[in-house]
Design a protein with these regions (language model features):
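A short, surface-exposed loop/turn module that caps and links secondary-structure elements
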Residues: 31-58
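Short, flexible helix/strand-to-coil boundary loops that buttress conserved ligand/catalytic motifs
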Residues: 19, 26, 37, 90-91
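Arg/Lys-rich, positively charged N-terminal/basic patches that mediate binding to nucleic acids
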Residues: 1-29
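Enriched for short, Lys/Arg-rich terminal
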Residues: 4, 13, 55-97
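A general secondary-structure junction signal
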Residues: 9, 47, 79-81
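Conserved short hydrophobic interaction patches
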Residues: 29-32, 83
Length: 97
């Protein structure tokens, strides 16, 4: 089964601010989710409905936070950012699980 991969508008705005090589690496890594939506680790606490896919680019750890909608066979990327900033940015976006 192949899932549809969507990027939430707030995530897209922040994504476009990243350097092109980082964008390309994040897009390539996110493609895994189409066939394996459970590839990322489940988050805990207030973001327990989100999952996080980890990758390292040029020595910097990045996270792709996403939500899986099984019935619709859809994945929505909520945010892609460096590990050090992702939870602060999720809080700023006021995402509700």
């Amino acid at each position: 089964m192949t899932y549809t991969l969507n990027i939430a508008k707030p995530a897209l705005v922040l994504f476009k601010k990243l350097p092109k090589p980082i964008q390309q690496a994040l897009i390539a890594k996110a493609q895994v989710l189409k066939t394996n939506p459970q590839a990322g680790e489940p988050l805990k606490g207030k973001y327990r409905l989100l999952r996080s896919l980890h990758l390292t680019i040029d020595g910097t750890a990045y996270r792709i936070s996403y939500q899986v909608f099984q019935k619709q066979e859809t994945i929505v990327v909520r945010l892609a950012a460096s590990r050090e900033n992702i939870y602060r940015k999720l809080d700023e976006m006021k995402l509700k699980p």
